Amino acid sequence: MNTERTLVLIKPDGVRRGLIGEIISRFERKGLKIKALKMLRLTREKAEEFYSVHRGKPFFVSLIEFMTSGPIIAMILEGDMAISVVRRMIGPTDGREAPPGTIRGDYSLSKSQNVVHASDSPESAMREIRVIFKDDEIIDW
C-alpha cells in the first residue's frame, strides 16, 4: 500500500453553489480518510503563495481574484495512492472536457471556475498543505 496525503480545495464557485457535502461525500465513499478540514477565506498574500508556481502566467491575476472572491473549503485526504486517485476523481482542469462522473465533469462548465483544486504530485501536496494547514490542525487517526 502506498499511503499518501493530498490537498483538496473546494473553490469559491463550489462553495457558492452548495456542493461542499456532495464533493466531500464522493471522497469519503471512495475510502479516502479526511485528516484535516476547514473553511477559510484566502487572503491575497496566501493565494499568491499557494499559486506561486503560476506567477507570471497570463491567468495568474484572475486566478488570485477568483480564489479570494469567497470562502473555500480546504481538506487533507489520505489513502492508497491518494494523489492520483483524487486527480482521476476530479477530472481534467477544463470542466467542459471532463468526463461525466468526475467532479468537474458533473459540476463545471469552465476552465477557470472548475469547482475544485487537488495537488498534482507528492511535492506539491507537501508544499500546499504547509501553506494552508498548521501541524496541529492535522489529525492522525
Swiss-Prot record:
Function per UniProt: Major role in the synthesis of nucleoside triphosphates other than ATP. The ATP gamma phosphate is transferred to the NDP beta phosphate via a ping-pong mechanism, using a phosphorylated active-site intermediate.
SUPFAM superfamilies in UniProt: Nucleoside diphosphate kinase, NDK
Residues at the active site: 117 (pros-phosphohistidine intermediate)
HAMAP family tied to this protein: NDP_kinase
Substrates-to-products reaction catalysed: a 2'-deoxyribonucleoside 5'-diphosphate + ATP = a 2'-deoxyribonucleoside 5'-triphosphate + ADP; a ribonucleoside 5'-diphosphate + ATP = a ribonucleoside 5'-triphosphate + ADP
GO MF assignments: ATP binding; metal ion binding; nucleoside diphosphate kinase activity
Official protein name in the record: Nucleoside diphosphate kinase
Keywords recorded for this protein, A-Z: ATP-binding, Cytoplasm, Kinase, Magnesium, Metal-binding, Nucleotide metabolism, Nucleotide-binding, Phosphoprotein, Transferase
Cofactor(s) demanded: Mg(2+)
Main location: cytoplasm
Similarity field: Belongs to the NDK family.
Keyword Transcription regulation: no
Record-linked InterPro entries: NDK-like_dom, NDK-like_dom_sf, Nucleoside_diP_kinase, Nucleoside_diP_kinase_AS
Residues reported to bind ATP: 11, 59, 87, 93, 104, 114
Top class in the EC scheme: transferase
GO BP of this protein: CTP biosynthetic process; GTP biosynthetic process; UTP biosynthetic process
One GO CC annotation: cytoplasm
SMART domains listed in its UniProt record: NDK
Alphabetical list of Gene3D superfamilies matching this protein: Nucleoside diphosphate kinase-like domain (3.30.70.141)
Pfam families cross-referenced by the UniProt entry: NDK (PF00334)
Stretch forming the signal peptide: none
Localization of this protein: Cytoplasm
EC number of the protein: 2.7.4.6
